[in-house]
């Protein structure tokens, strides 16, 4: 894919991920890296994302949703490389299974989620995701299967 085409695709994906998907916008998700091997999302801790007011920790649903989004982004970037970055030809992507392991309380000023493709076949992709806080502590891991097509 040419640099100009890559930049245009990244701008489009950023716009879709950050502005057009209302829930992503509500969570404050920002794309930090379009690296196909390890895309990265970031969001800041805010009062409306707290799941336990007494302990002031991140809601588990925010963690799982963010891991799901970064998994989907990993697939989109992989498909972009295969399809020469033409979004119109992208197949539909849907989560068919998502597992999250909550390893530590979601404390931090901000959080980073990354995704890595474990296996991608003609119809199913398997992704491993991780979420770290601003101190670099691993707070959750996820594994997901997505239908592609």
Question: Which residues does each PLM region occupy?
Answer:
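Hot-dog-fold acyl-thioester-processing enzymes
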Residues: 49-74
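Catalytic strand-loop segment that frames the active site of acyl-thioester-processing enzymes
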Residues: 30-58
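Residue-level preference for beta-strand/loop junctions
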Residues: 23, 37, 92-94, 109, ...
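N-terminal structural module
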Residues: 14-39
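Short structured motifs
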Residues: 25-31, 97-101, 113, 142
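HotDog/MaoC-like acyl-thioester-processing domains
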Residues: 3-7, 76, 105-149
């Amino acid at each position: 894919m040419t640099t100009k085409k890559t930049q245009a695709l990244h701008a489009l994906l950023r716009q879709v991920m950050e502005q057009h998907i209302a829930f992503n916008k509500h969570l404050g998700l920002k794309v930090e890296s379009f690296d196909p091997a390890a895309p990265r999302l970031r969001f800041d801790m805010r009062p409306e994302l707290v799941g336990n007011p007494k302990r002031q920790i991140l809601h588990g649903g925010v963690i799982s949703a963010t891991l799901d989004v970064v998994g989907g982004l990993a697939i989109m970037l992989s498909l972009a490389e295969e399809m020469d970055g033409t979004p119109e030809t992208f197949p539909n992507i849907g989560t068919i299974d998502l597992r999250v392991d909550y390893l530590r309380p979601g404390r931090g000023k901000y959080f980073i989620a990354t995704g890595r493709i474990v296996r991608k076949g003609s119809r199913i992709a398997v992704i491993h995701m991780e979420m770290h806080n601003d101190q670099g502590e691993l707070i959750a891991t996820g594994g997901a299967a997505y239908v592609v097509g």
